[in-house]
Design a protein with these regions (language model features):
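Mid-domain alpha/beta scaffold segments of enzyme catalytic cores
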Residues: 1-231
Length: 231
């Protein structure tokens, strides 16, 4: 089984590993380079003045790599800073320019993340660039289902994580049941060896909520990941 989003190897057969990450890359793993939105918060260490150029060089030197985890965040601060917006837009533009897939973060502001993608899609369409169109993995998506059709139109996928195991997360569990089968993925979002959720347990819970079998959900995860990575 593949872990669609994590920050270190979790024991799955294959991983989509995002920065910031620790440990080594395993055979078959896909790495995503990018600056997390929390790095743009006032209390974070200042970024190098060459951070964007450094990111570009790393991506060019690793043709199989994607861009992520990037995005916007209103979990830590109610207002999104200009530096966070500019940092997200710069990295998203780079993904479009190089034709790389993207892992997205959008805590409490998914609508704004979707709006940014749509804006750039129009800009790059006008430039008539014959580049591969990025796919987008909406990691930890937890907004109402009303945004899901727009995500699907953007060539987006939604990954379901450990929150589905929380019996008290009623709204999230209802959302998981509504995600179209063709864009559903599974993730642990593991950041350390102490907090690795069981991908099998997540698959079992998702299967229960969707009235199907864990094996069917696992097969769906693998086929959808193939589609996500093939764009």
């Amino acid at each position: 089984m593949t872990d669609a989003h994590c920050h270190l190897r979790t024991g799955a057969k294959r991983h989509l590993i995002c920065e910031p990450f620790s440990g080594e890359r395993g055979e078959g793993d896909i790495v995503f380079y990018g600056v997390h939105p929390w790095a743009f918060l006032p209390e974070s260490e200042p970024l190098s003045v060459t951070w964007l150029q450094d990111l570009r060089e790393r991506l060019i030197n690793d043709p199989s790599a994607g861009v992520g985890e990037i995005g916007l965040d209103r979990l830590k601060e109610k207002e999104i800073s200009l530096s966070m917006r500019e940092g997200f837009f710069a990295q998203l533009s780079l993904a479009f320019e190089l034709g790389r897939n993207v892992v997205l973060h959008g805590a409490k502001c998914w609508g704004q993340v979707v709006a940014a993608i749509k804006k750039l899609q129009e800009e790059f369409k006008e430039k008539a660039l014959s580049l591969p169109k990025p796919s987008f993995l909406f990691h930890g998506f937890s907004r109402s289902g009303g945004l899901i059709p727009e995500i699907a139109k953007l060539n987006g996928f939604i990954s379901v994580g450990p929150a589905v195991l929380n019996d008290h997360a009623a709204n999230y569990r209802r959302l998981v049941a509504e995600i179209p089968s063709e864009i559903l993925l599974l993730e642990t979002d593991a950041t350390s060896e102490e907090n690795i959720a069981s991908l099998e347990e997540i698959a079992e819970e998702v299967a229960s909520l969707r009235s199907t079998s864990p094996s069917a959900i696992i097969a769906l995860n693998e086929s959808n990941l193939t589609r996500f990575l093939s764009h």
